[in-house]
Design a protein with these regions (language model features):
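Short loop->beta-strand "edge-of-pocket" segments that line small-molecule binding or catalytic clefts
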Residues: 32-38, 133-147
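Periplasmic-binding protein-like
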Residues: 116-124, 191-232, 252-270
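Flexible hinge/capping segments at coil-to-helix
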Residues: 27, 124-141
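A ligand-binding cleft/hinge motif common to bilobed small-molecule-binding domains
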Residues: 85, 99-107, 154, 176-177, ...
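Extended ligand-binding regions for polar small-molecule ligands
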Residues: 2-4, 59-68, 147, 212-254
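Ligand-binding clefts/hinges and TM-proximal coupling segments of bilobed small-molecule sensing domains
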Residues: 15, 19, 151-165, 202-204, ...
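Short helix-initiation/N-cap motifs at beta->coil->alpha
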Residues: 21, 74-85, 128, 145-148, ...
Length: 270
């Protein structure tokens, strides 16, 4: 049987060997397990709780994918910079790690239909709040390697000094330790973090374009991609991602965000 809720025990998958050919849908079904790459340290989207179980918005979705495929799910922890490589090396079948769709990434992987909307945000200590990008002049901004925040600031604000980390947990610890003046990543994530860390505030709540978050598969894995798209459309009929939000995000955000500003149903962005 497969897990039907967000309480999936943390585990790691082994690489499928030296071949770079992605597993087909039939091969995944026959194996009885789908390998899904998720974050282990990006609460409330993908994280490991104190019982060693994977939790979060992406994980709730991943559990449903496995259930509807009729397989178990094997979670593989990824960091932002490793997401593409884990697909191309077949360490995972699908990435569900808060993966923002960009033109550059779409050259390397195939994105399915989106299930979430997002922009960038900037969090900083309340006593030295960064509320405008101009406030970052002469300051150090913490970002994750391989993230849209890194790309955005390098392209649009090259004079801003960036301090980069592989892991989100490292990045936030750097902010707590005062190694940087602010941190930028998805606004959905910094809003959640600031609510749980007294003395910090999101001074810039929406920066850059409104982007979408989507599952990704290895380039050319059309069969799995088509199945994912059909699944996302089908889930839209039951308002699945509204339920996902209410289960995993609403307990964190409360009334500070509007559900429909974040959630995408049936792959259709409104």
């Amino acid at each position: 049987c497969s897990n039907s809720d967000a309480d999936s025990t943390a585990s790691s998958a082994s690489s499928s060997g030296n071949t770079a050919k992605a597993r087909t849908l039939d091969e995944i079904k026959k194996s009885g397990t789908i390998r899904i790459g998720v974050f282990a340290d990006k609460k409330p989207f993908g994280y490991v709780d104190d019982k060693g179980a994977y939790q979060g918005y992406d994980v709730y979705f991943a559990n449903r994918l496995a259930k509807d495929l009729g397989v178990d799910v094997d979670y593989v922890a990824v960091d932002p910079a490793s997401r593409v490589e884990y697909l191309t090396s077949t360490k995972v079948d699908v990435i569900l790690a808060n993966f923002t769709v960009t033109d550059e990434r779409a050259k390397q992987v195939d994105f399915a239909l989106p299930y979430m909307k997002v922009a960038l945000g900037v969090v900083s200590p309340s006593q030295n709040l960064i509320s405008l990008v101009d406030d970052l002049k002469g300051k150090t901004l913490i970002v994750g390697k391989g993230t849209t925040a890194e790309t955005y600031f390098e392209e649009h604000y090259p004079d801003v000094k960036l301090l980069k980390y592989d892991q989100y947990s490292e990045a936030y610890q750097a902010l707590l330790d005062g190694r940087g003046d602010a941190l930028s990543t998805d606004n959905t994530e910094v809003l959640a973090w600031a609510l749980e860390n007294k003395g910090y505030q999101v001074g810039i709540t929406s920066l850059g374009d409104i982007d979408t978050i989507a599952p990704a598969v290895q380039k050319g894995n059309t069969e799995l991609l088509n199945w994912l798209n059909d699944e996302i459309k089908s889930l839209g009929n039951e308002q699945f991602f509204h339920k996902d939000y209410q289960k995993t995000l609403e307990p964190v955000y409360g009334q500070t965000t509007n559900l429909d500003d974040l959630v995408v149903e049936g792959g259709v962005v409104n």
